[in-house]
Structure formats: C-alpha cells, structure tokens
Amino acid sequence: MIKQTLREFARSNKTIFLDDFMKIAHQDKKSGYYTTKKPIGKNGDFITAPEVSQIFGEIIAIKIIEKINQLNVTQFNLIELGPGRGSLMMDIVRVLDNFLDKNIVNYSLYFHEINKFYINKLKTIFPDSQIKDEFSDYRNQYTIFIANEFFDALPIRQITKRNDIFFETAVKINEKNKLELSYVEPRKESLEYIN
C-alpha cells in the first residue's frame, strides 16, 4: 500500500527527495509506518529504553524536579514528542506525582503523537492530558520537552559530494518499475547551510 503511494508520488514528480520519501513512508495517514502500525514493544519492530526499565523515566523525573525547584517554577507544561505507548511518561508522572506538592507546583501534560492506536492508548492512560499536533497550541509558560528517540524518525535531507560536485539523495522509479536510490542535483534550499 505505501509502495503504491510512493510510486504515484514518484511518477508525478519524477523523483522523490529523501525527506519527502521518509515523510510519506512514516507519516502517510492511510499507510504510513508511524501512523498505522504498532512498531514499539515486544510484538513490534523495536523497543526503547522505557520499555526495558523504568529507571530511565525516573531519572528524567528527578532532573525535572531539580530544575523546577532551582528556578522556583510553579506552573509548567510537560510535553512529550512521539510518546508511543506512553511508557516513559508513565514513569516520569509517577515520580512527579509522588514528590511534587500539588498545592505548590502544577503541570499540564501534553503529547505530540500521530499514531492513531497510540493516541487512543494515551487518552486512556492519561485522561487529563491533551494531544496536540501544532506547537502553537501549548500554554505560554515554562515548558519541558521530552523527546526520546523522536528525532530519529524525522525526515532528513542527505547531501553528498563526489568529485567536487554536490548531489542530493532521492528515490526514483527504475525501468523495472521498482523504487531505487538516485543522486540528483540538490534543491537550492538544501545547499544553503553548506559551505
């Protein structure tokens, strides 16, 4: 299903730049990897530190408590980007709720998640939380972001240099109607940060 979406995009655009390819493959609403599958956990494709041990989340919670005490913060946003099944935040919240005096310090819990299965699970586990898809939707107050393995899944642009010529990685359809890597002239904006 996702291959068909990618082929159609490649046919209409000649090539798919790597960042567009990754965005479609990961985030397509109908068949994207992170939007339609359950990739995390024993029955998924990978596990993350919070799935193995609660100590990772507990250490993060202790650092949060240290920081808000140091800065005398009484209200803050706690936002997790790409929380998956919510394992990390369960560990963090458990420690925060045990050690923060709710009469003095309050936090608003938010998630930035695109997977429909995980969104439903998060709503069940954290009924007082909010799930957002725009960064402008958060309260304007002290904010702590948690992003365990979130950036690993973001689309990237890849530039290579061969014989003093820059190329940008893309995907195209070959003569056998298969998707294959290609190295093409970079988009102008892709070269802006290269000296």
What residue ranges belong to the model's regions?
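Rossmann-like AdoMet
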Residues: 1-81, 85-129, 133-134, 138
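Class I S-adenosyl-L-methionine
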Residues: 7-8, 20, 139-142, 146-195
